[in-house]
């Protein structure tokens, strides 16, 4: 059933409802019969595929290869790394039986009690344990290192409060798992992959991010350090867009993965893991979109240019078809994804609204008068500005326009982010400022107790200790809550 554009809630009225409306009405995703699991629709999946393709290229350029590991993990594997199991225990889905049978009373299918597994299996919440049990078979000597593997997969975390793309029980992601001979090499890998994520977010998603290291409280379960990229959404909330973890030797020790080093000594392997998920779709939607619908960065838009004819009869349509064919072919030859929508089952006005809703970056329109004048109407989705251009050289103009749109939406998001970072020195000012949204740089005494208190009283968390902090932020001061010494300012926000 067709969706009317007017049904979209305004951001200023209810931002959360606007987001939910937009995901469904732009045909990105919908709820499924399984609580917390979503159906990613073809248009939404096409955006994810473009993200996936670009990230995959970036991983391969940095020497990584793809592999695939089992969905099911023996329960005993999770017990081997105490912090890890503690971090994920409450979210694990457990497989206990391997067979169904028809009920004797004809009431339907039941679990066969005779088919109980000897050991329960966990549907992967993340794959460190199954991968490190495998790496044990692959690694004997320093010559076997490094191992630089990535996996594209689905994972299951039994979330109680779910939202499409942002927090779902099942989601798609990639997870990199690397093994190294030295601590220095592993730490460098974890930071390198964080910078890959940062480059992807800024150059392709047009989402400005702050890179930094997580506090101990916010660290990944089983990691020695967690690095993060943090984006700021239009409602002033932060969104963690990707993380990279330096795991030390924790998993190598848990699974006894040792190697003979260059000095012929036995040592445990050093590890990293890193991942981004379909949560990036949420970041993309919330960073750029407006009350008319999606605003997609051209680098990730499934359709970069749509062409719509306006005609009075079949004869006029044939002439427009002939004129447009050459333009379509030239755009495709430039590597631009273009759709010519001459279907007669929808009126032009409906098509305009639908492509605006779906965030197509550039719309070209040709009518009878345009045909006579050798012109087209050009509309850019980010500003909704229209102009009439000659068809001569329009392909080069559109190519440049797509780059201008990509740069413009990044700059707009960057300006918003920079306007919503403030420094505060007192807890009262912090509590007042956090209600306005945005990032806050403030002093903290470094203790988890103070961090927990701030979270409990304000719902704000430490997003990271930013890498690119200014000199004043790196200067020691006093904790805004306790007055105790603080090594530096850290970045706070309320977050998704």
UniProtKB/Swiss-Prot annotation:
PROSITE patterns: AA_TRNA_LIGASE_II. GO terms for cellular component: aminoacyl-tRNA synthetase multienzyme complex; cytoplasm. InterPro entries: aa-tRNA-synt_IIb, aa-tRNA-synth_II, aa-tRNA-synth_II/BPL/LPL, Anticodon-bd, Anticodon-bd_dom_sf, Pro-tRNA-ligase_IIa_arc-type, Pro-tRNA_ligase_II_C, Pro-tRNA_synth_II. It is found in: Cytoplasm. Its EC number is 6.1.1.15. Pfam families: HGTP_anticodon, ProRS-C_1, tRNA-synt_2b. The keyword Aminoacyl-tRNA synthetase applies. Keywords: Aminoacyl-tRNA synthetase, ATP-binding, Cytoplasm, Ligase, Nucleotide-binding, Protein biosynthesis. SMART domains: ProRS-C_1. GO terms for molecular function: ATP binding; proline-tRNA ligase activity. It comes from the Bacteria. It catalyses: tRNA(Pro) + L-proline + ATP = L-prolyl-tRNA(Pro) + AMP + diphosphate. GO terms for biological process: prolyl-tRNA aminoacylation. Catalyzes the attachment of proline to tRNA(Pro) in a two-step reaction: proline is first activated by ATP to form Pro-AMP and then transferred to the acceptor end of tRNA(Pro). Consists of three domains: the N-terminal catalytic domain, the anticodon-binding domain and the C-terminal extension. Belongs to the class-II aminoacyl-tRNA synthetase family. ProS type 3 subfamily. Homodimer. This is Proline--tRNA ligase. It comes from Phocaeicola vulgatus (strain ATCC 8482 / DSM 1447 / JCM 5826 / CCUG 4940 / NBRC 14291 / NCTC 11154) (Bacteroides vulgatus). The gene is proS.
């Amino acid at each position: 059933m067709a969706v009317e554009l007017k049904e979209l809630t305004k951001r200023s009225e209810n931002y959360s409802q606007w987001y939910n409306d937009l995901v469904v009405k732009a045909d990105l995703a919908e709820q499924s019969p399984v609580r917390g699991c979503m159906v990613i629709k073809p248009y939404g999946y096409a955006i994810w595929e473009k993200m996936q393709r670009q990230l995959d290229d970036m991983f391969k350029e940095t020497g990584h290869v793809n592999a695939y590991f089992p969905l099911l993990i023996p329960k005993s594997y999770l017990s081997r790394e105490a912090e890890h199991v503690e971090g994920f225990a409450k979210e694990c889905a457990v497989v206990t039986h391997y067979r169904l049978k028809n009920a004797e009373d004809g009431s339907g299918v039941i679990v066969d009690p005779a088919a109980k597994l000897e050991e329960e299996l966990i549907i992967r919440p993340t794959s460190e344990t199954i991968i490190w049990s495998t790496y044990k078979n692959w690694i004997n000597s320093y010559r076997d290192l490094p191992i630089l593997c990535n996996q594209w997969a689905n994972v299951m975390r039994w979330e109680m409060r779910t939202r499409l793309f942002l927090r779902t029980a099942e989601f798609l992601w990639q997870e990199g798992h690397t093994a190294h001979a030295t601590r220095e090499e592993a730490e460098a890998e974890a930071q390198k992959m964080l910078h890959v994520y940062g480059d992807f977010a800024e150059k392709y998603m047009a989402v400005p991010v702050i890179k930094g290291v997580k506090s101990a409280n916010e660290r990944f379960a089983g990691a020695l350090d967690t690095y993060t990229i943090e984006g700021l959404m239009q409602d002033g909330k932060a969104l963690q867009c990707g993380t990279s973890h330096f795991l030390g030797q924790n998993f190598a020790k848990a699974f006894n993965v040792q190697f003979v080093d260059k000095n012929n000594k036995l040592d445990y392997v050093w590890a990293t893991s890193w991942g981004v998920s379909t949560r990036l779709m949420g970041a993309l939607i919330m960073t750029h979109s407006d009350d008319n619908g999606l605003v997609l960065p051209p680098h990730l838009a499934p359709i970069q240019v749509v062409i719509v004819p306006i005609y009075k009869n079949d004869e006029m349509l044939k002439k427009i078809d002939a004129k447009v064919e050459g333009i379509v072919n030239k755009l495709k030859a430039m590597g631009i994804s273009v759709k010519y929508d001459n279907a007669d089952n929808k009126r032009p006005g409906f098509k305009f609204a639908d492509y605006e809703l779906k965030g197509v970056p550039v719309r070209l329109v040709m009518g009878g008068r345009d045909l006579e004048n050798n012109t087209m109407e050009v509309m850019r989705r980010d500003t909704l500005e229209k102009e009439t251009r000659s068809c001569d050289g329009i392909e080069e103009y559109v190519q440049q326009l797509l780059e201008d749109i990509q740069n413009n939406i990044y700059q707009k998001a960057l300006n918003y982010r920079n306007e919503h970072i403030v420094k505060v020195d007192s807890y009262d000012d912090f509590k007042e400022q956090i209600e306005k949204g945005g990032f806050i740089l403030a002093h903290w005494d470094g203790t988890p107790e103070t961090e927990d208190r701030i979270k409990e009283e304000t719902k704000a968390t430490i997003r990271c200790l930013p890498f690119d902090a200014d000199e004043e932020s790196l200067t020691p001061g006093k904790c805004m809550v306790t007055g105790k010494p603080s090594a530096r300012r850290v970045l706070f926000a309320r977050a998704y």
